[in-house]
Amino acid sequence: MISRRTLLAASAAAAALPTVVALASRASATASTLSIDLHNTTGSDTVYAHITGLALDNGSAWFLLQADGRTPYYPPSPPTTGTPRGADCAIPLGPSGTTTRVTIPHLAGGRIWFSIDSPLTFLVNPGPALVFPSVTNTSDANIGLMWDFCEFTFNNSVLWANLSMVDFTAIPIALTSTGAAGTQTAPGLPAGGLDTVCTALQAQSATDGQGWNQLVVTSGGANLRALSPTNGIVQNPALLSGYFNGYLDQVWSKYASQPLSVDTQGQWGTVTGQISGGVLDFPGIGSFTRPSSADIFSCNSGPFNTTGAEM
C-alpha cells in the first residue's frame, strides 16, 4: 500500500534539477485521501501553501484546498474572466521548523505551491478554468513574490511527485515518501542554491555576452528567481537568438554526408536517417526540420513537435 504520509519540505536552499520520484507501484491500491506533511524550513515564519489539481473522483473538476487544509473548494464558472476565487485557499504554514498537515483527495495534474511573505493570487475564468501565477506576465499579481511549486498525481493506484524545476527556480522543495516500500527522497539543492545559479548566469553572460543575466529576476537587490531560457525568450524574443547556430551548422553538414543511427530503445530499435534537402529523414519513421535555438531550449516547438510522426 502507498504511504498515507508524504513530507514536502520548503527548504532555505534553491531548486534542484527536475527529479521524478515514483512513490508507489502502479499496481498498488491507494486510499481515497492522502495526508501530506508540509515542513517549513525556509527560515521565514510567513509561508503559505496552495494545492490545486483536477479532482478525479468529482468529474475532474478544478480543485483547490481551503485554508483549513481539509475542505475542498470547487470554483464555479464565473461570468467574466479574471474573477477572484470565492474561498480562502491560502494555507498558512507554521513558523520555520514546524510541520502543517493537510489532506487531499485523488488529484491529477496536482501542484503544491509555496509562497513567502504573502499568499498567491489565483483567478478563475469561465469554464471554470484556473488562472495560475505567472513568471513572465509582468502584470500578474504574483510577479513580485517569492513562490514556487512541485507537481504530483495521486490516483487510485499510484502517487507520482516531481520537483518540476523546468520553467524557473526559486524556493527549493524537497520530497520524502515513507511507506511499505521504504523511504524515498528527492532533496533539491543545498542552501544558497538559488544564489549559486544566479551568480553562474551572471558570470556566463559576462563571458560570452549572450544575455544570460536577463534570466535572473531580482527584488530589492535580492535574487527572486532564475528563469529558464524559454521563459526568458518569452520576455525578450531576441534573447539567445542564434545561440546554437554554429553547432547546428556542423551537425547538418556532417549528416548530409553520412548517415545517423539512433538507438530508440523502443519498438523501432535502431533507426538510420540522413539529411537531404535540409531535412533529417528517417524513412518510414519520420522527418525533422532543422531546429532554431529557441526550439532547442524549449524542446516542444519546431521539429520537437512531432505529434504527426511515429517518433
Set out the residue ranges of the language-model regions.
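N-terminal export signals
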Residues: 6-26
